[in-house]
Amino acid sequence: MNYQLLLENIYNEVKNLENTGKIADYIPELAKVNPDKFGISLVDSTGNIFEVGDAKETFSIQSISKVLTTAIIFAKEGNELWKRVGFEPSGNAFNSLIQLEYEKGIPRNPFLNAGSLVIADLMLDHFEKPKEYFLNFVRTLSENPNIQSNASVAQSELESGFRNAALVNFIKS
């Protein structure tokens, strides 16, 4: 299969669609991101890399990290993990307090903010330096030793994370 041609066809079909997404402007540092950046990268099973558009552009992975941290913790906890966080879908917003209250403080799944906060707590339990462990995990998985965390984005998240603080306090209660 000609993956490069396939990616180019997808890219050309999608790039001119109306941009209906929304930048996460509630996080000041992310509000600065150019919404017109668009790239696709694919690595096939033999390690060949195919790219189109802004695929070389660095970006903040944000909630993609939830998948990666969940994989790390599932490897440590196995099915015991599901006693702390569920694995059911949710029709509510990713940062909903209502869902958490309805579920009596047990997040519905690890991909909601409340669930990812439980996963972060488990990262603290399992690793002396969880941020360093996570970064090394991502570097190894991606075969890219240049991946870095972004201090400006982290600080921006911290300064605007009031809802996440509320979620943590609700879980603790």
Where do the protein language model's features map onto the residues?
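Active-site-adjacent helix/loop patches that line small-molecule binding or acyl-intermediate pockets
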Residues: N2-V14, E18-N19, A75, N79, ...
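Glycine/charged-rich beta-loop-alpha catalytic/anionic-binding loops adjacent to active sites
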Residues: N48-K56, S96-E103
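A short, structure-level motif marking secondary-structure boundaries and short turns
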Residues: P28, D54-A55, S152-V153
